[in-house]
UniProtKB/Swiss-Prot annotation:
This is Protein-L-isoaspartate O-methyltransferase 1. The active site is at S61. It is an enzyme of class 2 (transferase). Its EC number is 2.1.1.77. Its main location: cytoplasm. The keyword 4Fe-4S does not apply. It holds the Pfam family PCMT. The lineage of its organism: Bacteria, Pseudomonadati, Thermodesulfobacteriota, Desulfuromonadia, Desulfuromonadales. It comes from Pelobacter propionicus (strain DSM 2379 / NBRC 103807 / OttBd1). It comes from the Bacteria. The keyword ATP-binding does not apply. NCBIfam families: pimt (TIGR00080), PRK00312.1 (NF001453). InterPro entries: PCMT, SAM-dependent_MTases_sf. SUPFAM superfamilies: S-adenosyl-L-methionine-dependent methyltransferases. Belongs to the methyltransferase superfamily. L-isoaspartyl/D-aspartyl protein methyltransferase family.
Length: 215
């Protein structure tokens, strides 16, 4: 299979034609090999318009969803970004191509170790990965806050205040919010006066966020 050709087709037909216009996001997805982040047996499906299982009851998100969430973060290349839920590491790699520094947290150790290996193979050394497998631990990376952008790759019942507290002024948080079966993408922006501006985007379905801020 020609992965380069499949990746180009993915960007053109699944992402650009559905309204993603940020050239930097499109370029990052064109250059990032999604197939190395999926199980070897599923490599041929890596550029399909769907999420795929990556083990440990977790999934790699649909390419369009990755592109949309990334575009909503409005990254320029100077940001410090927090990712909750490293998963396969694919979303992390896209962020690393678009931001100055990425801090990513994963609760499932085998996933985190596989993701780290993939990220290192791409020489993405601006990624700091933490394994936080304690159920009672607070969400986020408080000692490195504030963050210019925060992305959550699991569905939550509400926007966790502990994350909005870690946003810098003008910082953006993108998170799926809803119930365990269906959510909507929510974008939060922290304004100069400390208030939070909320907008809602498309419906989506993510694995549930686990812990005190989830289920």
């Amino acid at each position: 299979m020609n992965f380069d050709r499949a990746r180009k087709k993915m960007v053109q037909e699944q992402i650009a034609t559905r309204g993603i216009t940020d050239r930097r996001v499109l370029d990052a997805m064109l250059k990032t090999p999604r197939h190395i982040f999926v199980q070897e047996a599923m490599a041929a499906q890596a550029y399909s318009d769907s999420s795929l299982p990556v083990g440990e009851k977790q999934t790699i998100s649909q390419p369009y969803t990755v592109a949309l969430m990334t575009e909503l973060l409005e990254l320029t290349g100077r940001e410090k970004v927090l990712e909750i839920g490293t998963g396969s590491g694919y979303q992390t790699a896209i962020l690393a191509a678009l931001a100055d520094r990425v801090y990513t947290v994963e609760r499932i150790r085998p996933l985190a170790l596989r993701a780290r290996k993939c990220l290192d193979s791409l020489r993405l050394f601006n990624v700091m990965l933490r394994i936080n497998d304690s159920e009672g631990s607070p969400i986020g990376w408080d000692e490195e806050a504030p963050f210019d952008a925060i992305i959550v790759t699991a569905g939550a019942p509400a926007v966790p205040q502990v994350l909005t507290d870690q946003l810098a002024v003008d910082g953006r948080l993108v998170i799926p919010v809803g119930d365990e079966r269906e959510q909507r993408l929510v974008k939060i922006v922290r304004k100069n006066d400390g208030t939070l501006e909320t907008t809602t985007s498309i419906g989506c379905r993510f694995v549930p966020l686990i812990g005190r801020q989830g289920w």
